[in-house]
Amino acid sequence: MFSILLRLSLVTKIFIAIILGFVVAFLFPNMTPYFSIFGEIFIKALKAVAPILVFVLVISSIANFNVEQSAKNFKPILFLYIVSMLFAAFSAVIADLLFPTTLVLASSADQAFQPPGSLNDVLKNLILSFVSNPVVALSEANFIGILAWAIILGTAFRHSTQATKTVLQDCADAIGKVIHLVISFAPIGIFGLVAVTFAHSGIETLKSYSHLLLVLLGTMFFMALIVNPIMVACVIKKNPYPLVFKCLRESGITAFFTRSSAANIPVNLDLARRCGVDESTSNVIIPLGSTVNMCGAAITITVLTLATVNTLGISVDIWTMLILCVVASISACGASGVAGGSLLLVPVACSLFGISSDIAMQVVAIGMVISVLQDSTETALNSSTDVLFVIAVDQASKT
């Protein structure tokens, strides 16, 4: 029996854990305190690895970033990737304004934090976080400071020897294995979190989860079926939907089940080849897109951050939301290197509003509960968009 469980996929294990959590919460609510330790350990582990994860991955990604100068159409495709992520984050902001989401957080009222009072406070906190001591930033989980120092060091390491870059990549791979180990215990942690949360809050929690999931998926579908086609139409000057549906059908469906943009690269390369894209372009741009083009991740980060803000009663003006869009887009670029995807980068955006790491990691755990659908749909959007823009720009350049 135990060996059969070990052979199951992580998604299946999480699904089983959620069901068991429901059963324990509603049939044996008095037993849930005994299981709370599982959720607490899981959140503690996430909090422990997240700062060093972001720091090492960003340094390694920037230091090893390499684009062949011969790659055709690089600039317009990269421009579409950037604009797409910004539009995705902005769409998530609009979705939150139309359908505001709140979450059920454990002991959120007990958390002491000082939310920013205005845009000036946000900008001041942002600038001060940038110049924070890197060691202090890591120890206090100041993700803005971590991101700033990682970008600076990564840029500096670009001029180092190949051996140094290889060491950085090896460090990133090692951290990735640690994250994989932590995530492998997600079913046990989620079981404890679901059992305790539903035993205390009941059906209201289920309503908040379903509403959050609908907002996330609705925004992703809006991006895939409305925003992306408009962008493609502006490029190819004709009906974009045949190409959009082709990419969703041949790339998106595969990515939905693999839940990995990197694993879907061969599928995208084959699709680009069959659509007549020059291999000197597709072989460079599509792997790059699987790393930096993360519009689905930008949506997830923005929606979850604003849901946290709504839950804590923090007032946010439109200018702060626009800053959040930029931060979410930048954070999303690092999502491909994280086993938990965009979820583990939510604390970066939450730190804009003075939200503590404790609360942010509770939100990450909530995201993992709905990740069976959220992460699959997010990956499908990310990967299909990678190849969509490559084919669109290639077609436009040939007309």
From Swiss-Prot:
Keyword Cell inner membrane among record annotations: yes
A GO molecular function held by the record: symporter activity
Biological process annotations from GO: serine transport; threonine transport
GO cellular component, one term: plasma membrane
Transmembrane recorded as keyword: yes
UniProt xrefs under NCBIfam families: PRK13628.1
Name of protein: Serine/threonine transporter SstT
Annotated source species: Acinetobacter baylyi (strain ATCC 33305 / BD413 / ADP1)
Annotated gene: sstT
